Amino acid sequence: MERAIFAGGCFWCMVQPFEEQAGILSVRSGYTGGHLPNPSYEQVCAKTTGHTEAVEIIFDPEEISYKELVELYWVQTDPTDAFGQFEDRGDNYRPVIYYTTERQKEIAEQSKANLQASGRFDQPIVTTIEPAEPFYLAEDYHQGFYKKNPKRYAQSSAIRHQFLEENWS
């Protein structure tokens, strides 16, 4: 099994696309990239800890490759927006691919270069690629949020879905 960590704005919106793929064992919401051990949601939202909201994915590389996960990541995000994603603004919502191995770093960097060269976006691809740091699980009520709170999830992801439809379909 391998581990991947992606930050793409609100973690509520990043779970379902990965969870629906064959070869995914788990997708958990949490916080990473900051300086405070085991932060709370309130602390991260206060924008003082340096953490991003992220998802940790445990996957079977025999069924789905890291490259496929990175490609799926791109189409869930606006890779030209370094200051948050869609409705969610601020450093804690910045887009980041966190790599856990040098091979993951190489795959992510090549994928980013390919996306930039594709001309799909007029602006530069600003998603950062950074080494993985400790991942702290978010509170239980955040786990599987789209299943537990479908109406609130739909409301909180409307602008994201519109962007994805217009730019990735």
Swiss-Prot record:
Reaction(s) this enzyme catalyzes, per UniProt: L-methionyl-[protein] + [thioredoxin]-disulfide + H2O = L-methionyl-(S)-S-oxide-[protein] + [thioredoxin]-dithiol; [thioredoxin]-disulfide + L-methionine + H2O = L-methionine (S)-S-oxide + [thioredoxin]-dithiol
Active site: C10
GO terms (BP aspect): protein modification process
Record EC number: 1.8.4.11
InterPro entries assigned: Met_Sox_Rdtase_MsrA_dom, Met_Sox_Rdtase_MsrA_sf
SUPFAM superfamilies from the UniProt entry: Peptide methionine sulfoxide reductase
UniProt-listed Gene3D superfamilies: Peptide methionine sulphoxide reductase MsrA
Record-annotated membrane-spanning stretches: none
Domain of life: Bacteria
Keyword line: Oxidoreductase
GO MF annotation list: L-methionine:thioredoxin-disulfide S-oxidoreductase activity; peptide-methionine (S)-S-oxide reductase activity
Keyword Aminoacyl-tRNA synthetase: no
Keyword Heme: no
Enzyme class label: oxidoreductase
Stated family: Belongs to the MsrA Met sulfoxide reductase family.
Functional description taken from the UniProt entry: Has an important function as a repair enzyme for proteins that have been inactivated by oxidation. Catalyzes the reversible oxidation-reduction of methionine sulfoxide in proteins to methionine.
Classification via HAMAP family: MsrA
Descriptive protein name: Peptide methionine sulfoxide reductase MsrA
Originating species: Streptococcus pyogenes serotype M3 (strain ATCC BAA-595 / MGAS315)
